[in-house]
Amino acid sequence: MYPEDSRVSGGVATVDFLEGTYDYAAPTPAPTPLYSHSTPGYYSAPLDAHGPPSDGSLQSLGSGPNSPLVFVPSSPHLSPFMHPPTHHYLETTSTPIYRSSVPSSQHSVSREDQCGTSDDSYSVGESGAGAGAAGFEMAKEMRFCAVCSDYASGYHYGVWSCEGCKAFFKRSIQGHNDYMCPATNQCTIDRNRRKSCQACRLRKCYEVGMMKGGVRKDRGRVLRRDKRRTGTSDRDKASKGLEHRTAPPQDRRKHISSSAGGGGGKSSVISMPPDQVLLLLRGAEPPMLCSRQKVNRPYTEVTVMTLLTSMADKELVHMIAWAKKLPGFLQLSLHDQVQLLESSWLEVLMIGLIWRSIHCPGKLIFAQDLILDRSEGDCVEGMAEIFDMLLATASRFRMLKLKPEEFVCLKAIILLNSGAFSFCTGTMEPLHDSAAVQNMLDTITDALIHHINQSGCSAQQQSRRQAQLLLLLSHIRHMSNKGMEHLYSMKCKNKVPLYDLLLEMLDAHRVHRPDRPAETWSQADREPLFTSRNSSSSSGGGGGGSSSAGSTSGPQVNLESPTGPGVLQLRVHPHPMKPTE
């Protein structure tokens, strides 16, 4: 494409190229802007595809694939909407580019560019201090709602949020709204689906940091208040505050847990209001599972134990996911997370079973399609006593009219209280950060007391109910010990197929017990607890009789987590051991 000749008529020059004729605006004294609002943005065309004429005073402006090529001179009479001479396709990480002030409907910028660009990149470059200030103003405008990812209208209730989420959170905290999720408390909340589930939307509001007070104490507001006191500007503090405000919600929560009050993640958990704790606990509840196993009646000992151990293995996976959602649990060390779960897993499963069976007298609801009564559990040797204790505790729950908020608090207390006192003579190591676990336990206990205080009863009745609820935990611990002994005896008799995750938890509990018989454990059991072993040895532990106890391998806990530190991962094998007829 080379120009052959040019003709000027009425201020418009016509250039004849080999492939066609194009018009461009020649320099005229009239300050008429040539920019049209109907031509949005620029597209990244090759630099040498449509080069300017040889005079070098013109600059190419692409208006889209279907529009003719228009050349506009770089004169001082350009429209104020014109982009600076440096184009987007020249943008690199080493040269900061300032976005133009074109409205969002005309200038499309991807969300990744808006979120991924930090405030520190908007420094004064080749365009001067004026362009740097304009870029900084645009960076402040490019905010997204931390809840639904829509465009944020401002800093509301401690986070950047849109008008819709701000109004929703305001209505929720002013009124008494008992939202219930119709699904599994894991609904996706975005711009299009934020109105589909109010419970998950409110839960996400609390997760991203919305607070009733309206101001996060550890955010940039403190920075501006200190700046007004001293009257001086600290550039390092300002950049740190801006980076904190523009970080994603996950990074903000990590920053809060590591910098609040000098106490790590403990301060953020302690300062959490009781209503928020209760909402997080209810949102962390796992869904009700299905057995999906068709077994002919009447049940036999092998079929009942196979059904129960299969359901227990499935529930263990969901129990680990539930524990991760507890406030402050992921801030614990991996050793403490594993130890708490291994010490309380059967108690947690039992209180969940009792809660599901609270409205069905005489029956235990293990799953939606697995409901057993005492007569069906009596076919297993030693199971009738455990069934009677479970049904009696469910009757006690029903008599006390246990509420969902009280149940989730008791369930979390069982998990955290299991590591409060380490065994003196066992192989169980003490918790690395027992103070953090105690702080979590105190926070959840305060939430339970706060909920009881809102019942409107007298102080004496409130104190009595607190004692009645906490006394239930001793019964659940007693049932757990009975169930553990029964499950281990079934394993030794080779009457039940133990799945890998269930076997790991069972063996870990036996290793942790101080009163276990020393002669029943081999040298392999005295190896370090948290080591990865071959799964075939653990599956073969049910070979029969007392020899199975001697060859039982320890729990297989994968410490090298691919998802980062503080995330518990237990190795789960999909193929269980087949029962021996």
Curated annotation (Swiss-Prot):
<dbReference type="InterPro" id="IPR035500">
    <property type="entry name" value="NHR-like_dom_sf"/>
</dbReference>
<keyword id="KW-0804">Transcription</keyword>
<feature type="compositionally biased region" description="Basic and acidic residues">
    <location>
        <begin position="514"/>
        <end position="528"/>
    </location>
</feature>
<dbReference type="InterPro" id="IPR000536">
    <property type="entry name" value="Nucl_hrmn_rcpt_lig-bd"/>
</dbReference>
<dbReference type="GO" id="GO:0005496">
    <property type="term" value="F:steroid binding"/>
</dbReference>
<keyword id="KW-0754">Steroid-binding</keyword>
<dbReference type="InterPro" id="IPR013088">
    <property type="entry name" value="Znf_NHR/GATA"/>
</dbReference>
<dbReference type="InterPro" id="IPR001628">
    <property type="entry name" value="Znf_hrmn_rcpt"/>
</dbReference>
<dbReference type="InterPro" id="IPR024178">
    <property type="entry name" value="Est_rcpt/est-rel_rcp"/>
</dbReference>
<dbReference type="GO" id="GO:0042562">
    <property type="term" value="F:hormone binding"/>
</dbReference>
<keyword id="KW-0446">Lipid-binding</keyword>
<dbReference type="InterPro" id="IPR050200">
    <property type="entry name" value="Nuclear_hormone_rcpt_NR3"/>
</dbReference>
<protein>
    <recommendedName>
        <fullName>Estrogen receptor</fullName>
    </recommendedName>
</protein>
<keyword id="KW-0862">Zinc</keyword>
<dbReference type="GO" id="GO:0005634">
    <property type="term" value="C:nucleus"/>
</dbReference>
<dbReference type="Pfam" id="PF00105">
    <property type="entry name" value="zf-C4"/>
</dbReference>
<comment type="subunit">
    <text>Binds DNA as a homodimer. Can form a heterodimer with ER-beta.</text>
</comment>
<dbReference type="InterPro" id="IPR046944">
    <property type="entry name" value="Estr_rcpt_N"/>
</dbReference>
<keyword id="KW-0238">DNA-binding</keyword>
<feature type="domain" description="NR LBD">
    <location>
        <begin position="273"/>
        <end position="509"/>
    </location>
</feature>
<feature type="DNA-binding region" description="Nuclear receptor">
    <location>
        <begin position="142"/>
        <end position="217"/>
    </location>
</feature>
<dbReference type="InterPro" id="IPR001723">
    <property type="entry name" value="Nuclear_hrmn_rcpt"/>
</dbReference>
<feature type="zinc finger region" description="NR C4-type">
    <location>
        <begin position="145"/>
        <end position="165"/>
    </location>
</feature>
<dbReference type="GO" id="GO:0030284">
    <property type="term" value="F:nuclear estrogen receptor activity"/>
</dbReference>
<comment type="similarity">
    <text>Belongs to the nuclear hormone receptor family. NR3 subfamily.</text>
</comment>
<feature type="compositionally biased region" description="Basic and acidic residues">
    <location>
        <begin position="216"/>
        <end position="246"/>
    </location>
</feature>
<feature type="zinc finger region" description="NR C4-type">
    <location>
        <begin position="181"/>
        <end position="200"/>
    </location>
</feature>
<feature type="region of interest" description="Hinge">
    <location>
        <begin position="211"/>
        <end position="272"/>
    </location>
</feature>
<feature type="region of interest" description="Disordered">
    <location>
        <begin position="99"/>
        <end position="123"/>
    </location>
</feature>
<feature type="region of interest" description="Disordered">
    <location>
        <begin position="216"/>
        <end position="269"/>
    </location>
</feature>
<feature type="region of interest" description="Disordered">
    <location>
        <begin position="45"/>
        <end position="66"/>
    </location>
</feature>
<keyword id="KW-0675">Receptor</keyword>
<feature type="compositionally biased region" description="Polar residues">
    <location>
        <begin position="56"/>
        <end position="66"/>
    </location>
</feature>
<dbReference type="Pfam" id="PF02159">
    <property type="entry name" value="Oest_recep"/>
</dbReference>
<feature type="region of interest" description="Modulating">
    <location>
        <begin position="1"/>
        <end position="144"/>
    </location>
</feature>
<feature type="region of interest" description="Disordered">
    <location>
        <begin position="514"/>
        <end position="581"/>
    </location>
</feature>
<feature type="compositionally biased region" description="Basic residues">
    <location>
        <begin position="572"/>
        <end position="581"/>
    </location>
</feature>
<dbReference type="Pfam" id="PF00104">
    <property type="entry name" value="Hormone_recep"/>
</dbReference>
<keyword id="KW-0539">Nucleus</keyword>
<dbReference type="GO" id="GO:0043565">
    <property type="term" value="F:sequence-specific DNA binding"/>
</dbReference>
<dbReference type="InterPro" id="IPR001292">
    <property type="entry name" value="Estr_rcpt"/>
</dbReference>
<keyword id="KW-0805">Transcription regulation</keyword>
